[in-house]
């Protein structure tokens, strides 16, 4: 679904956008959020993309960065402590309409002894229905239950918990084609159509528990504006409980902006561009982490997919894994090699000043990268079970592809295709499957990152 319940049923929302005066105008203009628009039809013939890709999900062509009134593109306002609900909106009484589904913006009714809410479709791996529990111990084992100690430089005494993904299921899907704007894309809305159908048919995500924001919809609350995106992010994580499974999917333009708080070793924050970014500004990774990651309690799964450029660390998750399932850390050897090459080059020229300057620059860069990495583990580690799949590294672009005559994002296609071919894969197997789907056509490298140290040999559940 792609509408919101009235504010009396939805207390959350970003306090900064739109301003209070604009909120009042919007409430006067839209006295109720109305009925949901018709659902997207199922998308068939999801075939491999053609080559070459017609475009890139990079920066929208424009002079400079979009205007914004603060370092992170939003008007600052007092924020509640992490783990608390966002400020209340002024209540108002909408016209009478049937009540929304209990799962949409509300806690589901209590059903003691009802068992897990999700048992999986045939072939889909769950913690209780997979090859490993049926005796094939060469298959990926399901995630453990209970708390797991962190280690790996995380705060001492801290623990996290894997989600078994049997609880409440909610999804936020955002696709922006930027109609009528420079840098218009073609496949982002199709990505949302395909993903919503896949989640509904294969993982039992109910349509009424999906918020869909695309710029082809007439309902103003369904447009992917900055205000709507931020409000929907708050809705997604509201009232989350252990073993819930939340899903976030963004397909659109992504980019980078100078980092102002020192949490990025390359000096740039990753951003996404709402449909109204030229007026409202972009959304920075720090803000997405604050809204969608930090409030989550232990045992809640958030699966995030960013099919956009420069998206490798779009949620600022500190644990990034290679296709060998190994935790990536700052590559000091690579930096050392580059630094040594510069020193040797300067020595060969007899330029002692440059040699010293190059050596000192390398030391500072390597030290800064290691310090940033350690600080990220201390401040961005989470007890929740947050997994992010991104279409490219921070320095790469992502392809806007054509799939059997239909425009779509390469990562969105590869993710669904890889899971359909083999639903019972470990994390590292799925990462390699996605990479293999992309490898024959594109240079982009998919990324897997997590909010906690991850055993990549465990069964991937969702």
UniProtKB/Swiss-Prot annotation:
Annotated spans, Disordered: 1-150
The protein's UniProt keywords, in alphabetical order, are:
Apoptosis, Hydrolase, Protease, Thiol protease, Zymogen
Top-level taxon of origin: Eukaryota
**What GO CC terms are in its UniProt record?**
cytoplasm
- Which residues are annotated as active site? 253, 309
* A GO molecular-function descriptor: cysteine-type endopeptidase activity
Checking InterPro entries in the record gives: Caspase-like_dom_sf (IPR029030), Metacaspase (IPR050452), Pept_C14_caspase (IPR011600)
UniProt EC number: 3.4.22.-
Q: According to the UniProt entry, which residue ranges have a biased composition of type Low complexity? A: 22-33
Q: Where is the composition biased (Pro residues)?
A: 1-21, 49-69, 77-102
Which GO biological process annotations does it have?
A: apoptotic process; proteolysis
**Family, per entry:** Belongs to the peptidase C14B family.
What is this protein's function?
Answer: Involved in cell death (apoptosis).
What is the protein name given in its UniProt record? Metacaspase-1
- Which organism is this protein's natural source? Coccidioides immitis (strain RS)
* Gene behind this protein: MCA1
């Amino acid at each position: 679904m792609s509408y919101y319940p009235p504010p009396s049923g939805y207390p959350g929302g970003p306090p900064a956008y739109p301003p209070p005066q604009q909120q009042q105008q919007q409430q006067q203009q839209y006295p109720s959020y109305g009925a949901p628009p018709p659902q997207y039809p199922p998308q068939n013939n999801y075939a491999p993309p053609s080559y070459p890709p017609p475009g890139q999900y990079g920066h929208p062509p424009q002079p400079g960065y979009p205007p914004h009134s603060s370092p992170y593109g939003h008007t600052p306002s007092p924020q509640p402590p992490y783990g608390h609900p966002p400020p209340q909106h002024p209540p108002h009484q909408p016209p009478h309409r049937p009540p929304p589904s209990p799962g949409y913006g509300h806690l589901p009714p209590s059903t003691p002894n009802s068992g897990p809410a999700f048992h999986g479709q045939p072939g889909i791996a769950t913690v209780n229905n997979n090859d490993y529990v049926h005796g094939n111990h060469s298959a990926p084992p399901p995630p453990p239950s209970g708390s797991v100690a962190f280690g790996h430089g995380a705060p001492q005494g801290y623990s996290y918990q894997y989600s078994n993904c049997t609880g409440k299921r909610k999804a936020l899907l955002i696709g922006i084609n930027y109609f009528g704007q420079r840098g218009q894309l073609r496949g982002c809305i199709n990505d949302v159509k395909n993903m919503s159908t896949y989640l509904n048919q294969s993982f039992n995500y109910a349509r009424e528990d999906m918020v869909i924001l695309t710029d082809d919809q007439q309902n103003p609350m369904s447009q992917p504006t900055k205000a709507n995106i931020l409000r929907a992010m708050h809705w997604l994580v509201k009232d989350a409980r252990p073993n819930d499974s939340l899903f976030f999917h963004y397909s659109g333009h992504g980019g980078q902006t100078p980092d102002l708080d020192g949490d990025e070793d390359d000096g740039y924050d990753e951003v996404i561009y709402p449909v109204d970014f030229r007026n409202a500004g972009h959304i920075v990774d720090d803000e997405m982490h604050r809204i969608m990651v930090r409030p989550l309690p232990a045992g809640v799964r958030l699966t995030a997919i960013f099919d956009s450029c420069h998206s490798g660390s779009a949620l600022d998750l500190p644990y990034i894994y290679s296709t060998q399932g190994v935790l990536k850390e700052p590559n000091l050897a690579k930096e050392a090699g580059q630094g040594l090459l510069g020193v040797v080059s300067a020595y060969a020229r007899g330029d002692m000043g440059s040699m010293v300057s190059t050596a000192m620059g390398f030391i500072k860069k390597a030290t800064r990268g290691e310090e940033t990495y350690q600080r990220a583990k201390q401040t961005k580690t989470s007890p929740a079970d947050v997994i992010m799949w991104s279409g490219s590294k921070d320095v790469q672009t992502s392809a806007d592809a054509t799939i059997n005559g239909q425009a779509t994002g390469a990562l969105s296609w590869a993710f669904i295709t890889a899971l359909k071919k083999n639903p019972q894969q470990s994390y590292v197997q799925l990462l390699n499957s996605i990479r293999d789907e992309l490898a024959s056509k594109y240079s982009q490298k998919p990324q897997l990152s997590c909010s906690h140290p991850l055993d990549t040999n465990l069964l991937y559940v969702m």
